[in-house]
Amino acid sequence: MKRTIIMMLDSFGVGASADAASFGDVGSDTFGHIAKACAEGKADIGREGPLKLPNLARLGLGHAAMESTGAFAPGFGDNVELIGAYGHAQELSSGKDTPSGHWEMAGVPVLFEWGYFSEHQNSFPKELTDKILARAGLDGFLGNCHASGTTILEELGEEHMRSGKPIFYTSADSVFQIACHEETFGLDNLYRLCEITREELAPYNIGRVIARPFNGTGPSDFARTGNRKDYSLEPPAKTVLDKLKAAGGEVVSVGKIADIYAYCGITKKVKANGLEDLFDATLAEVKSAGDNTIVFTNFVDFDSHYGHRRDVAGYAKGLEYFDARLPEMLALLGEDDLLILTADHGCDPTWQGTDHTREYVPVLAYGAGLKAGSLGRRNSFADIGQSIASHFKLEPMAYGESFI
């Protein structure tokens, strides 16, 4: 029985990529800087001491990062019995965003330029917002700027609740984000507004519209809920997910995967929120998955809760939780199963600003007859998609080189 389990540690980069200078990210290193902060006692909130990831280390994380950066991260070294194949991958796509990383990993790199709202204030064209408001029957909006999602709730959440005006904001990514209170504005109203916005953005080539629902009564307790929804464009070509589905296989999305691929190539969607819930749901799906199945999970908290919020201790604690549960996953794998752990970009919690960082991502592969050892530097995330196609004996993808 052949299956592939993909565990996407959203934003878990392993060092600045060769083209990082083009993105202002030279020196960024999500994994390395977290490990360094832990070793120096600077990440002892909710946890303490050096970063402890023994299971990821056995799968080759420390070695993959060493090959990427030229040095082992603090607390990681050669004194580990490797059980997995490991490498690091350069992104071929033009952006450092979520859709680009995910699509490329599935065999379809983004070779065009996304549209962006580059102005930090008055970010959105009036012509665009006028059309959105008219169609939605709204008399105004708040925000219209680059912002941290949590900070903008503190600044504008109460005014939003009083006025009923949605909060529009963006970032360095190709994204239009809309924050609204679940009770005072209504979740269905937020989703409808996002659907309208997605349609009106067609001429702008924006990658995603993101619904950012929140609850609470004031700045001290405003919090995003688990009802986030991404409205993505469809990938420009068939991904390996589409090809497996067309061949009669199953593709199970856990978390936000289905949204990222605009439901293309997905046969089942499982909703889950938070690291524990996502891990539980992944294990449950693997236990019940049959032959020719992909179970694909995005562990978004690493990015949204820790990377963007520049929370080093939180990121470290999340990684240690994830690592402690990996033996549960390994115990479920058959000899023909393929487990892949990777990321879609970096988001160094020690870096300036709040945006993603252009980094190599780890490629940790276990099972399917792979020998423990180095896979080297991969020239594209698409090598993962090509390897999955090879594993299932599907028609080869147009991009990528298999390591199977």
UniProtKB/Swiss-Prot annotation:
Cofactor dependence: Mn(2+)
Instruction: Identify the InterPro entries for this entry.
Output: Alkaline_phosphatase_core_sf, DeoB, Metalloenzyme, Phosphopentomutase_DeoB_cap_sf
- What is the first-listed, main subcellular location in coarse terms? cytoplasm
List residues binding Mn(2+) 1: D10, D344, H345
Write out the GO cellular component annotations. cytosol
- Give GO MF terms, alphabetically: magnesium ion binding; manganese ion binding; phosphopentomutase activity
Q: What family, per the record?
A: Belongs to the phosphopentomutase family.
Question: Which HAMAP family does this chain map to?
Answer: Phosphopentomut
What name is this protein filed under?
Phosphopentomutase
Organism equals: Shewanella sp. (strain W3-18-1)
Give the encoding gene's name: deoB
